[in-house]
Amino acid sequence: MIYLDYSANTPVDEAVLERFCAVERSCPGNANSRHQAGAAAKAAIDEATQSIARSLNVQPAEIIYTSGASEANNFALKSIARLERHHGKHIISTPLEHSSVSGTLTALQEQGYEIDLVDIKQDGTVDLAHLRELLRPDTILVAVTAVDSELGMVQPVTEIAALLKDYPHCHLHVDLSLIHI
């Protein structure tokens, strides 16, 4: 079988699966427990966190684990909105977002945030000229998906980030996954 629906679910890399199984077998304890098995599980999580932090060039304390992408998107968007609410309530996104993003933005809109959707060009990418027009001093967030799950279009994330440099309170949320970091 040739599996092509990677946007819905991606088969786990064999090395990752082997490592997961090895850790599950050797560290079955609850990392929050004070017994030996819990301490071993905590040490394994701490080691993995250190490795991820090094790969991303961040501090381990900046790594937050969630149950999945939907929870992560929800958490990130709401956290940014609440963090920057004193600087503005304007958010820009695209009509192509996953429901975990669009649904969270709808909830924020119901709480008084203003949501604008940037136009998409015929090739499926963000219209950077329209994005530039939508940006305002009170824009606190631009949310885009790196690769559209239906069209497969890669968004110009680097160019979008460059547009935000003049907006110090505007964060860029990119829904994406990292492979082989």
Residue ranges and their predicted role:
Residues 1-179:
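Pyridoxal 5′-phosphate
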